[in-house]
Amino acid sequence: KEGPALMSRAVIADRYRLSWLALRRRLDILKGRATVHPLAGLFYWTSPGERLIIAPQELRTADPTRASEIYAGRFAFAGKIVICDGRSPFEMDPPNEEWAEELLGFSWLRHLRAADTAITRAHARALVDEWITLQGSWHPLAWQPEIVARRIISFLCQATLILDDADLRFYRRFLRNLTRQVRFLRATDTRDGIPRLQARIALTYASLCMAKQIRHLRGATRRLVQELERQVLPDGGHIGRNPGAIIEMLLDLLPLSQTFSARNVAPPPAITNAIDRMMPMLRFFRHGDGTFALFNGMGPTSSDVLATVLAYDDARGTPVANAPYSGYQRLDAASSMLLMDTGGPPPPELSAEAHAGCLAFEFSSKQQRVVVNCGMPGSGRENWRQVARATAAHSTVTFNDASSCRFLDFAPFRRLFGVPIVEGPENVTVARDSEHDAIVLRAAHDGYAERFGIIHERFVSLSADGNRLEGEDVFLPATGNAMPDEADDRFAVRFHLHPAIRANRLTDGHGAVLLLPNKDVWNLNAHEDVVAVEDSVYLAGHDGPRRTSQIVIYGRAREVHRVHWSFSHVPQTTPAGWRGSPREQLPP
């Protein structure tokens, strides 16, 4: 039923739309390439930035030990290591595209700056000079707009490192190349989402930091404000629905705001307002252990980066409970917390990292995550990325082993759009209330309505003391009173567990006991249904994929219209007869 022959009209329309966007993207790159052609001066006149006025602050954390590795010719990016053996890294064959993108974005210069020695400064200058020689005029990957944007920001932020002790010849050569990159980016559109926003930020930085670029500040700022108003939602979330995008935006916007002030120019109110909206969302998505919830492309949380950004949060208030524009809900009670995805997928061109996880939730107690989603793996693990986006990788319900969204894996689009979502839940309803001193959430989605004729409705209730989480999954016919054919009604209610949790199935089969690292015990009770404890994989670990467990309730919607389950805290230590064992790390 999911083959190309039955592809809906909406999917076909989205394919045509993506084809048009892909054509526009290629035309934009051709236009941008014309601006860096050796004869471009005959057609494009741009005053060179004769000098740099200011170097913005870099908020991304740096490791001075990485400088020694780079000096030794070991370039470790995206989970891969390339040893240069005296050759330039820009002449090496990259092990994967992610490695090449990190190399060509030059964000790693911050590690050399952290070492802050004459040797690292000279080495940084030599590497930049090598790149200008080998790829500074043109290179098909190095001159992709999103990489150019990242490189402009890196060159400006690390200008002190690059130019300290530089001779006049290199100084002028560097500025000529930087001007060329700015000119290219100004003439080229970038793919939608965070890359486009970073391009707007890069051009605004250039207008503030380069002496002869100030005349472009008004236009650059106007375009940046337009993107902020479009991409940052009223509740502070990002239009692409990835929680990690908030951190990425703030890492660039916070120092940009400071750069405006350093030039005695008031930052546009839209920048300040966007920052003020995003800051509370940092706390909204955080569990008790400080990590972000694993929804829609979120992978491992960099605790040091998050702490750096949170240091700019003057309010330090209680997290908001409701993010309706972003499509998330949060329940807090005592030391327990639940986060649920209650939104549909973003537009196809913004959905390269979005997941089919509607109505999935994560649950934590104190400083320990209990129920999680599998999460997005770190860079360099492409074989896991599409697995992570499937509905089965989330703590929600699947029907017939299918995802609630359709993904379009079409080779011509992969470089430009990844694997976008072209069909998913269109109607997601959510209601929030309080009943009997408990916070109650009711939500439903129609992601399975067209294919299987089923509406999934989920009810969750968290007690005031945080010791009991009640839940119910209800399966309703999408039209009339008829349930789907027997062949189409197989469901699985999944609860993926954090790798630190040990799970043991109860002898009656109707539940499981969960032991937390702090020796707290929680019971999962499935009441009238039978549970299975199965293997799962936690993908969002800093050290790679890890084995873990999932608790699954299987059934048929024609026979079981409601599945009632609950998690309850047990005031006792390790239960007698415990047979659980710690989880192991998976091979990459």
Can you name each region flagged by the protein language model?
Residues 2-85:
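Extreme N-terminal leader/anchor segments
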Residues 3, 8-9, 91, 149, ...:
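CBM-like, beta-strand-rich accessory domains located in the C-terminal region of large
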Residues 40-66, 80-114, 195-207:
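Long, acidic, intrinsically disordered low-complexity segments
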Residues 67-68, 322-324, 354-356, 390, ...:
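Short solvent-exposed loop/turn micro-motifs enriched in small/polar/acidic residues
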Residues 75, 329-333, 361-363, 506, ...:
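Short acidic-hydrophobic surface loop/beta-edge motif
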Residues 96-275:
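Aromatic-lined, polymer-binding surfaces characteristic
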Residues 104, 199, 327, 359, ...:
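Residues that flank catalytic or metal-binding motifs in active/ligand-binding sites
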Residues 233-376:
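Carbohydrate-active enzyme catalytic cores, enriched for enzymes
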